[in-house]
Structures are given as structure tokens and as C-alpha cells.
Amino acid sequence: MQARRKTRLYIVLAVLAGLGLTVSLTLYALSSNIDLFYTPGEIIYGKTETRALPHTGQRLRVGGYVQPGSLQRDPQTLDVRFKLYDARGVVDVSYKGILPDLFREGQGVVAQGVLDGERHITAQQVLAKHDENYTPPEVKNAMTPEKTGAQP
């Protein structure tokens, strides 16, 4: 009887250890694919709820409006630099590639990339809004002073 209990205990412990290892490896694999959404103000001052700041090297998506007069193109390459802003702040974005047709100053965009410095994002992808009347909800909420805590 005791030998049977010991065998069952070892089997249960082995199954639990295997399950724990599987969950750990799955969470580790998924964490490298998560891109959190930030606004320029949240990159500078932290998330409104938690005050958590993104760290250098973190993959993220940043949404805001292209600041008028900030677009700089290198005529020899596909390098582009511009600034994104919201009601609370401004961040620099650099991108190498062809921009979407709807990309222009004053329009809402989402840049997906890596935070290289305190206020600089190196984007791998830039998405422009697709319609004159559409603004992504995250960007719309970031631009309203009552949502951001900014004073009018």
C-alpha cells in the first residue's frame, strides 16, 4: 500500500512540475511578442493609472499626431524622422521605409517599434489612419484633456 502511494505521489509531482514548466515557457515566449500601447505623454510621464514608465529597449506602439513642421526626409535614403504629440507630450520617431499614402503632418498615426532613449522611438512599422472621420480610440482618449489630466 505504501509503495503505491509513493508512486502516485511521484507521478502527481512530475505532472505538476511538467505543467509548471510548460506554463513558464509559454509565458516567456508570449512576453517577447507583446507590444504595449503608449501615448507620447505616457512615455514621458508614465501611464495615468500606474505612473509606470516604459524602459529603454522595450517594444511598444505609440499613437499620436504628427507634429506640423517636424517631418524630415533624407533624399538619399528612405530614412524619415518626425515628432508625435498628444495633449501631454512630444516624442521623436525615426523610421526607415516607405510611409503609408495617408501619412501627413497633423494626421493621427501609430508607430510600432523600440524605445531607444527617453523620448526616441525607432519604428519598424508606421500606420496612418485610414479615413478622414476615424481616429483610433486610444489616440482620441489621449487627446482629450479630461482623460489625460491636463489643464485646459
Curated annotation (Swiss-Prot):
Residues 1-8 are cytoplasmic. PANTHER family: CYTOCHROME C-TYPE BIOGENESIS PROTEIN CCME HOMOLOG, MITOCHONDRIAL (PTHR34128:SF2). It is a single-pass type II membrane protein. This is Cytochrome c-type biogenesis protein CcmE. Residues 30-152 are periplasmic. NCBIfam families: PRK13165.1 (NF009638), PRK13254.1-1 (NF009727). GO terms for biological process: cytochrome complex assembly. Belongs to the CcmE/CycJ family. Heme chaperone required for the biogenesis of c-type cytochromes. Transiently binds heme delivered by CcmC and transfers the heme to apo-cytochromes in a process facilitated by CcmF and CcmH. GO terms for molecular function: heme binding; metal ion binding. Heme binds at H130, Y134. It comes from Klebsiella pneumoniae subsp. pneumoniae (strain ATCC 700721 / MGH 78578). Residues 133-152 are annotated as: Disordered. The chain crosses the membrane at residues 9-29. GO terms for cellular component: plasma membrane. It is found in: Cell inner membrane. Keywords: Cell inner membrane, Cell membrane, Cytochrome c-type biogenesis, Heme, Iron, Membrane, Metal-binding, Signal-anchor, Transmembrane, Transmembrane helix. InterPro entries: CcmE, CcmE-like_sf, NA-bd_OB-fold.
